[in-house]
Amino acid sequence: MNTIQVIIFAVVLVLTVTVGQADEDSPEASLLRKLKEAEASLFGQNLEESRNSRQKRCGGVDAPCDKDRPDCCSYAECLRPSGYGWWHGTYYCYRKRER
């Protein structure tokens, strides 16, 4: 009796392994993979185009900046100070003037 159970278990195991490998290439699996790829691309695109996302790590007003590589916020520009800070020789972020 024990031998028959082992043989049946081995046959069922072999059939499960061979049939299980064929299911990976099924139309449902490929459709699911394509949908996940499309969702990932759309989700990433929405994150890049979102106007509600904050600008990160930018120098605010009166923060030192580099003239060659300004890191001021979008509402500021990198200018040389005209008043009390001109002797430092560095540039600072100032609010953009409306023209």
From Swiss-Prot:
Keywords: Cleavage on pair of basic residues, Disulfide bond, Knottin, Secreted, Signal, Toxin. The keyword Cytoplasm does not apply. One of its GO terms (cellular component) is extracellular region. Expressed by the venom gland. Residues 23-57 form a propeptide. The keyword Transmembrane does not apply. InterPro entries: Toxin_22 (IPR012627). It is found in: Secreted. The presence of a 'disulfide through disulfide knot' structurally defines this protein as a knottin. This is U2-theraphotoxin-Lsp1a. It comes from Lasiodora sp. (strain IBSP 8539).
